[in-house]
């Protein structure tokens, strides 16, 4: 018997989870995240063969139903080092004269887009410009926003570079959401860097395509009736629950089986889509 932990995607301003289909019969238990109340499923079964899980999404209503700004205070979100020196802003980042966009732009200037950088697994200031992937960039950005006293949330999920049936997403993607004075903004600094933008712009999908969020927060801790599971850095793809209690990430491939209907602004995905994830 093998156990896998699979998240229940949240409802956000841009998406509403309509339905979720799992292979039947497949016994499961529902577990909840300790800080945010997010829900996940512990499935038990024979996973030696690939299994398909389908997620059906509709457009978001603009009203956020989940506590996306729940404060995850842990090693993945606390900044080590001097914030002011790192951002190199004329005034402290917490000053009223700075918008969230100033902090986002200051962090973006510290990065070039590249592969994963193991030196940036935990948020810390550094000198010069470093190469990193979306996780590295958003780890620093989230920690800087928190250190500046701003409301910020980290989302992990999937990005499909083309909005058509058959489009695949073999890896995960992540982005940041801020909210100040009632203004909510989505930030994908990694894609802005890839696009060669001189300054990050607010909004989803600056490179086009569509995305789906599968969790929010860093260092998620799910609890069963008998135990607390180890903290999960970010949760987009399913995890194996091994006998030693560890939660390694599963190998998956996601397929967009129906295109999302989008309006004139392709940064905001809408309507209904179906995602099928194959676990290896």
Give residue spans per PLM region.
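N-terminal short leaders/motifs
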Residues: 1-12, 123-135
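Alpha-helical and coiled-coil interaction segments, frequently adjacent to or embedded
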Residues: 1-18, 215-280
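Structured N-terminal alpha/beta-domain signature
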Residues: 2-5, 13-21, 65-67, 86-93, ...
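Secretory-pathway-linked proteins and extracytosolic
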Residues: 47-78, 243-260, 264
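Secondary-structure boundary elements
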Residues: 70-129, 148, 254, 258-266, ...
């Amino acid at each position: 018997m093998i156990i896998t932990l699979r998240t229940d995607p949240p409802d956000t301003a841009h998406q509403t989870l309509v339905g979720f289909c799992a292979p039947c019969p497949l016994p499961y238990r529902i577990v909840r995240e300790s800080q945010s109340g997010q829900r996940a499923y512990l499935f038990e079964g024979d996973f030696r063969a690939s299994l398909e899980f389908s997620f059906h999404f509709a457009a978001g209503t603009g009203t956020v139903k989940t506590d996306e700004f729940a404060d995850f205070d842990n090693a993945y979100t606390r900044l080590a080092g001097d914030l002011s020196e790192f951002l190199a802003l004329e005034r402290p980042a917490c000053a009223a004269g700075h918008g969230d966009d100033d902090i986002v732009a200051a962090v973006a200037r510290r990065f070039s887009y590249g592969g994963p950088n193991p030196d940036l697994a935990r948020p810390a200031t550094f000198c010069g410009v470093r190469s990193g992937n979306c996780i590295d960039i958003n780890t620093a950005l989230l920690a800087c926003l928190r250190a500046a006293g701003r409301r910020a949330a980290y989302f992990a999920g999937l990005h499909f570079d083309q909005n058509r049936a058959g489009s695949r997403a073999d890896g995960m993607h992540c982005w940041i959401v801020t909210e100040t004075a009632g203004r909510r903004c989505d930030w994908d600094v990694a894609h802005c860097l890839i696009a060669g933008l001189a300054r990050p712009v607010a909004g989803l999908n600056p490179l086009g395509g569509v995305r789906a969020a599968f969790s929010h927060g860093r260092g998620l801790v799910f609890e069963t009736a008998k135990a607390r599971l180890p903290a999960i850095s970010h949760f987009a793809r399913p995890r194996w629950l091994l006998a030693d209690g560890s939660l390694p990430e599963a190998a998956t491939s996601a397929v967009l089986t129906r295109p999302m209907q989008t309006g004139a602004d392709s940064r905001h995905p809408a309507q209904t889509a179906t995602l099928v994830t194959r676990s290896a």
